[in-house]
Amino acid sequence: MTKTKEIIKTGWNLDSTYAHLPKQFFTIITPNPVSAPKLVILNEPLATVLGLDSEALQSKDSLEVLAGNRALEGALPLAQAYAGHQFGHFALLGDGRALLLGEQITPSGERFDLQLKGSGPTPYSRGGDGRASLGPMLREYIISEAMHALGIATTRSLAVVTTGEAVIRETDLPGAILTRVAASHLRVGTFEYIAKWGTVQELRALADYTLQRHFPEVGAVENPYLSLVQEVIKGQAALIAKWQLVGFIHGVMNTDNMTISGETIDYGPCAFMDSYDPKTVFSSIDRQGRYAYGNQPHIAGWNLARFAETLLPLLHEDQDEAVKLAQDEISRFIQLYHSHWLTGMRAKLGIFNEEVQDESLIEELLKMMEKNHADYTNTFRALSFETLEGTALFGTTEFAQWHELWRARLNRQQESKDASQQLMQNSNPGVIPRNHRVEAALDAAVKQGDYSVMEQLLNVLSKPYAHSPEQAEYCMPPAPSNRPYRTFCGT
């Protein structure tokens, strides 16, 4: 392929190591071109991280790449095969509307998957058109970048391109393609697919590839596959704790949406909790509350058990011993998660050291928040700045008694009051992607072609711990007329 000056200048440096795995793992895809691609948003800071030139990315040649109209040298576009437990039921899945362009190698030697989401049908489309509409792609862009700013491991969004073509859902909608960036797209469901339909040799090849790509430091230990289980558990324990600490509800925690890298992936029906309630569910398809806020840690443990099951043939030649090894590791997940969560909750309350009664102090606050329908984010924000007024919770006798116990707890630690307050302000975001704010930005962009609302929202969300005056209006919870909020997967 002849390279243009624009392509050379852009900084594309693609490899396709995934294509070296057995052919059962993927299908090589010829991209489906679109008629009139247009770049509507570009993540310039992320482009810099990837070693890409933002100006050159906006050229016609690069636009053709981001739209799936053109392949790059070093790229071998493919759709990945995987399976998954969806709401507890096993299913054969795969990239039904996405293709992996390849792996961008940055100037520092890091490797990131570049995936086009909404790029057209694949052998795994299961009758779908393989396309995506603009609203859900912009939504993933907003929330994934907000998660990154919050310090939560996540896939990210490089660009959104409109296709100039309509996609048919309940009505005709503008088509779009998102360029998703990830440490990799290896999922628990990837291992489930090979464990179900592959050989032990293919399973070993996948595990070895994963170790080399994500955990090279444990590759030489006595039982590297047990170490793989341990590392994935550690990553997910830290991730789910961070979700809980900011009130994030994923909405579709199927095993195909749990990454091996420990990144959050798939922002279809997700949302952030307003009033604190462990039973909060936003997804329109989660009618039984399987993936409710309070269930997320337990579901993560269930998913990890499915992951460990796939590796049983590699853990030990004796099946009973392999099962015991896996069970021992899975049993540690909730304890590990809880340790991360408790440390994070202490920080949200300005607590530096550990005392036995800390957990009961935290749980008592959460019970009062639930009883009084207190806003989760704003309650901790108010505690951080000692602005304890204007809500039902702060006017109760229960809270006054709790507040006295909390102040006494802070006085028992060596750190100063100012240090505690700074810890709280660094641990409690002032702004989150409030559901009504996200919807307002999407309405302006999709219905009116006005991206200024979205750009302003992205700017505010990029500094969640700044607590600046211009963020004040974005801290407001939704009006009662905007509740209850429902999300849809957008597929």
Curated annotation (Swiss-Prot):
It catalyses: L-seryl-[protein] + ATP = 3-O-(5'-adenylyl)-L-seryl-[protein] + diphosphate; L-threonyl-[protein] + ATP = 3-O-(5'-adenylyl)-L-threonyl-[protein] + diphosphate; L-tyrosyl-[protein] + ATP = O-(5'-adenylyl)-L-tyrosyl-[protein] + diphosphate; L-histidyl-[protein] + UTP = N(tele)-(5'-uridylyl)-L-histidyl-[protein] + diphosphate. It comes from the Bacteria. One of its GO terms (molecular function) is magnesium ion binding. Keywords: ATP-binding, Magnesium, Manganese, Metal-binding, Nucleotide-binding, Nucleotidyltransferase, Transferase. Its EC number is 2.7.7.-, 2.7.7.108. InterPro entries: SelO (IPR003846). The keyword Iron-sulfur does not apply. It is an enzyme of class 2 (transferase). Its cofactor is Mg(2+); Mn(2+). ATP binds at G94, G96, R97, K117, D129, G130, R180, R187, D266. Mg(2+) binds at N257, D266. The active site is at D256 (proton acceptor). The keyword Hydrolase does not apply. Nucleotidyltransferase involved in the post-translational modification of proteins. It can catalyze the addition of adenosine monophosphate (AMP) or uridine monophosphate (UMP) to a protein, resulting in modifications known as AMPylation and UMPylation. Belongs to the SELO family. This is Protein nucleotidyltransferase YdiU. It comes from Alkaliphilus metalliredigens (strain QYMF).
